């Protein structure tokens, strides 16, 4: 763990970060401090500001509040493990769920948005999987 002092704030972060990672961590931690808590989480008994404290992790953070129940329903229907670091502000699993679950609630809107990435997309096969999507594949 390394303490970075930036703009008068002290950030407890991993020892080695690229410039991009450092910028992203600072952004995510500043958001966490402004909207959730200034309390750190711990990894191997060391405090890290990008980790959420256990109390918030148990409440399902950093999942976006309006999709938390949808995430849990999806996880029951298609069993998958929550990542070990789901309680990290830079969690890829949380980012994916926070981005795609709200979008995929409406397959027509989702198709219109996703066609920008997959130009030959016509529609989403809503009769398959969970309205045509699945967050994780473990089978």
Model-assigned labels for residue ranges:
Residues 1-138:
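Nuclease-adjacent, charged terminal/linker segments that flank catalytic cores
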């Amino acid at each position: 763990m390394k303490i970075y002092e930036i703009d008068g704030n002290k950030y407890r972060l991993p020892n080695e970060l690229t410039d991009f990672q450092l910028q992203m961590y600072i952004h995510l931690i500043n958001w966490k401090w402004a909207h959730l808590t200034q309390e750190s989480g711990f990894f191997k008994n060391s405090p890290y500001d990008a980790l959420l404290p256990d109390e918030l992790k148990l409440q399902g953070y950093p999942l976006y509040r309006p999709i938390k129940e949808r995430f849990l329903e999806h996880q029951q229907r298609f069993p998958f493990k929550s990542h070990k670091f789901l309680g990290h502000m830079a969690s890829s699993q949380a980012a994916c769920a926070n981005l795609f679950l709200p979008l995929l609630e409406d397959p027509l809107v989702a198709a219109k948005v996703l066609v920008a990435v997959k130009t030959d997309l016509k529609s989403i096969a809503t009769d398959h999987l969970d309205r045509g999507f699945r967050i994780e594949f473990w089978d």
